């Protein structure tokens, strides 16, 4: 969807302006860090410090009669998580590996897919991830957009964190947890959220509307084609 592509570009441009080029903070005093010069009051952390849960997904037992969905790596693309290629499965039990809104998912196996990052905008309670994906769940609303946008901005770096031989590469969970990340001060995050949240929620609304229309299409199209319904009935 072109509108969503434009919103994604705006969001990433905003992140880069604030946290790569430091445009809103150029009048502040800077200090040396492992990330180069950063504003005073900011500091270095590792990703695990900003998250409540980082884990690979589960091994699914596929079942087309189930209402539970499982996401594979083809569901993470273009910076978002999509349900287009989700499959149905029968879980043994519910776990933290069920996707929550604002989770960030990272493809974690295979050359060409590993390192691809997407944000889960949808708000559903029946979607899990398979073992080829790592879920990154920020621990608070204060950092959730920052963490997601930070990882989206570092997809090539994440790809290069892979281990293993060609064709059998994977991204170890511990490497994700220990990923160095710059942590802005609280005031900067609050100001950033005030701008990024309206964009994020518009993306959420657009994705939900697209999903709703797709479901409606899937229900109506077979009935129209069979003659059970006509255009006049709609």
What label would you give each PLM region?
Residues 1-58, 178, 182, 186-232:
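Non-catalytic DNA-recognition/assembly elements of restriction-modification systems
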Residues 18-21, 31-34, 54, 72, ...:
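Glycine-rich, flexible loop/turn motifs
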Residues 27-29, 60-67, 161-163:
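Short coil/turn segments at secondary-structure boundaries
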Residues 30-31, 45-60, 69-103, 129:
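Sequence-specific dsDNA recognition surfaces
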Residues 40, 45, 66, 100, ...:
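Structured loop/turn residues at beta-strand edges in well-structured enzyme cores
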Residues 64, 70, 105, 109-113, ...:
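A generic structured-segment signal
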Residues 72, 94-156, 162-167, 172-176:
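A short beta-sheet element
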């Amino acid at each position: 969807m072109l509108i969503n592509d434009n919103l994604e570009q705006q969001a990433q441009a905003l992140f880069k302006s604030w946290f790569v080029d430091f445009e809103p903070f150029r009048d502040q005093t800077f200090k040396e860090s492992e990330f180069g010069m950063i504003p005073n009051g900011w500091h270095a952390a590792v990703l695990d410090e900003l998250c409540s849960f980082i884990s690979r997904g589960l091994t699914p037992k596929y079942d087309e009669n189930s209402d539970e969905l499982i996401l594979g790596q083809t569901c993470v693309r273009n910076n978002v998580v999509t349900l287009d290629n989700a499959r149905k499965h029968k879980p043994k039990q519910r776990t933290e590996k069920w996707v929550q809104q604002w989770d960030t998912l990272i493809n974690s196996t295979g050359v060409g897919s590993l390192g691809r990052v997407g944000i889960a905008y949808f708000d559903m309670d029946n979607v899990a991830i398979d073992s080829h994906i790592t879920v990154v769940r920020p621990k608070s609303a204060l950092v959730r957009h920052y963490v997601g946008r930070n990882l989206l901005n570092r997809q090539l770096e994440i790809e290069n964190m892979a281990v293993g031989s060609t064709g059998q590469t994977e991204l170890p969970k511990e490497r994700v947890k220990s990923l160095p990340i710059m942590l802005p001060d609280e005031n900067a995050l609050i100001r950033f959220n005030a701008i990024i949240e309206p964009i994020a929620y518009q993306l959420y609304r657009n994705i939900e509307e697209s999903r709703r229309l797709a479901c409606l299409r899937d229900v109506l199209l077979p009935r129209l084609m069979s003659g059970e319904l006509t255009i006049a009935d709609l």
